[in-house]
């Protein structure tokens, strides 16, 4: 891979798994970037003029000739950087496997990432309050629960969806080192990012040790700091694919 001379700017919430997903991709490709941490609520003042009205992070400012001023949505960001910086690739060489990798990425984004969010915020509002019992933290959690319609019943349904998904991911990772093909792909980094909040939930750490080992390995490959919760886990990081 040649040296990449650019300095992208990633607008993010530091705790967002979708922002983590973009950082993993940028790190794996060796693309220099900086992050600007936005304040939830106030972030819309920064984003709306850049995105034409969109309010969600991540937003990437490529700051490159011939590129859009801003790219919103983690999937669109991955498409953009894969097109602009194809090596090392985050897609299999086979076109049918490329389609499969994007299909799994979309499934993780639209279903499993949301299920993880429900389970995580249900935990943080109950048994996980001690992680950060501050008034501000609890206010943010309650606002998130209200915004996304999270309650005990919806969180229980999310647990069931998550359990089925983890079974599928486990089988795929057991069959090979990667979810699709024989190299790291957008599917792997999406799984590693969106499932990382589960490291703060003791029951998941007990029931799915293989998951957190794989998440740690992918973070090592991408040169990304491990998420909160991993400091209490015994997992290995690998920096070779």
Task: Identify the role of each PLM range.
Residues 81-85, 108, 193-196, 218, ...:
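Alpha-helix boundary/capping residues
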């Amino acid at each position: 891979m040649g040296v990449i001379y650019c300095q992208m700017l990633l607008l993010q919430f530091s705790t967002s798994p979708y922002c983590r997903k973009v950082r993993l991709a940028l790190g794996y490709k060796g693309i220099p970037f900086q992050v600007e941490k936005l304040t939830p609520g106030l972030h819309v003042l920064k984003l709306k003029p850049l995105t034409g009205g969109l309010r969600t992070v991540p937003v990437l400012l490529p700051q490159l000739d011939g590129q859009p001023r801003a790219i919103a949505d983690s999937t669109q960001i991955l498409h953009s950087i894969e097109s602009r910086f194809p090596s090392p690739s985050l897609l299999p060489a086979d076109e049918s496997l490329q389609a499969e990798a994007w299909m799994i990425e979309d499934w993780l984004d639209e279903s499993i990432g949301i299920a993880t969010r429900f389970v995580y915020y249900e935990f943080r509002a109950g048994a996980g309050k001690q992680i950060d019992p501050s008034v501000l933290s609890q206010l943010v959690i309650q606002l998130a629960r209200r915004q996304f319609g999270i309650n005990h019943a919806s969180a229980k349904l999310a647990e069931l969806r998550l359990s089925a998904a983890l079974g599928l991911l486990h089988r795929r990772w057991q069959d090979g080192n990667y979810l699709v093909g024989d190299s790291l792909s957008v599917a792997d980094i999406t799984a590693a990012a969106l499932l990382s909040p589960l490291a703060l939930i003791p029951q998941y750490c007990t029931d799915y040790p293989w998951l957190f080992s794989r998440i740690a390995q992918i973070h090592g490959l991408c040169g990304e700091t491990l998420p909160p919760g991993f400091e209490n886990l015994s997992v290995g990081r690998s920096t070779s694919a």
